Every structure is written in C-alpha cells, then in structure tokens.
Amino acid sequence: MSFNIDEWEPKTKMGKLVKEGTITDIDEIFEKGLPIMELEIVDALVPDLEEEVMDVNLVQRMHKSGRKVNFRVIVAVGNKNGYVGLGQGKAKEVGPAIRKAVDNAKYNLIKVRRGCGDWGCVCGKEHTVPFKVQGKASSVSVSLMPAPAGVGLVVGDVGKTILNLAGIKDVWSQSFGQTQTTVNFANAIFDALKTLSAVKASEADLKKMGVKY
C-alpha cells in the first residue's frame, strides 16, 4: 500500500515537523543524531525504498506449554542511492514476520558514505566505498575495500543485495567466519556500512575520495 501523507496523523514532534514541511530531508535528522520514532517519517522523506527478503528461517524454542515455532525473517531496504536499512522480524506466520522486518529495517535506515576511493580510478563518481572498512557480527567479520568502476560487487550474494540497495556498484571484499549464516553475514555487511560514516576524515581527504558529503 502506497503512503499517503495526508492521511498520516503524526504522534511525535519530529513527525509533525515532517508533515508540515519544516523537515524536508532525512539528512537533517541523521545529522542531529535523532532516532526515528515513526515509520511514516521514512515513508515521507525516502519514498523510493525497495525491499528485499534476505532470509526466512523457522525458529523453535521450548516453552512450558510445549514447543513454540516462529518464523524469523531478515529484510533489507534501500533506495539504491545512499540509503539502506536492515531489519529482523519474528512471528508465527511468514507474512507478519516480513512486515515486522520491513518496519525494523526502516527504523534502522542509515546514510551510506560513497565515493571513488580506488587509486586506479579517477572517475570521481560515488560508485564504491571511499576507503577500507570492516564490519563484524558474531563470528563473521567482513572487510569492504574500494574498487575501480566496472569491477562490480566482489562479495557474496547477501552482500551484493545489501550493497546494491545502498547504491554501491563496485567493491572488493574479504570475509571470515561462518559466512554461510545469512543473518550474521548480513549484519556484518551492515555494520561495515555504518562504520563508513563514523570514520573521521578531513574535507580535503573526503574530496580526494570523491565523497559528496
């Protein structure tokens, strides 16, 4: 169902500022480090998000009333132009689990720092990671490295999906640990992307690496 801002009744101050048009860019929220408390904020400011179901898994646990079975779903969302999110959802049925995962992915949305960081590429476009970065989740660790334009995404399928949704087209990678575990590999990739924005660099260095922000 498409989002209709006119039907939205914001419950938070931030939501009201978005609906009235005072906040028109999600970067204003990210720059202040404010948490997103309403999904409609993301729907209004980043309306072109795409969704990809990464994994559907059956999870069982013992309860005093018997064995409980839930579906655990991992979903990635992104606009293929610098914004991506990853979320997990659990429910007794697949449909509700997917919806929960999509919602959580939107709450976890981040802006991804992109650039042209490979020394052999001088295109100046935002097609790769601007510098080497590492991410970790449980036993899985991943390194993402700048690659020249045209190389493509040299990473596992889970990583390709997330990086593609983030708008990264070229990357070299190394991974260690139980990378066949989708949830951990996906979280490690996402952790690496979050680290991109956390690394401090001078404006001059960022300009050299083709970073636009």
Curated annotation (Swiss-Prot):
What GO cellular component term, any one, is given? cytosolic small ribosomal subunit
Listed under GO biological process in this entry are: translation
**Keyword Phosphoprotein: yes or no?**
no
**GO MF annotations in UniProt:** rRNA binding; structural constituent of ribosome
NCBIfam families xrefs: PRK04044.1 (NF003125), uS5_euk_arch (TIGR01020)
- Subunit-level organization: Part of the 30S ribosomal subunit. Contacts protein S4.
Q: What is known of its domains?
A: The N-terminal domain interacts with the head of the 30S subunit; the C-terminal domain interacts with the body and contacts protein S4. The interaction surface between S4 and S5 is involved in control of translational fidelity.
User: Would you tell me the protein name for this molecule?
Assistant: Small ribosomal subunit protein uS5
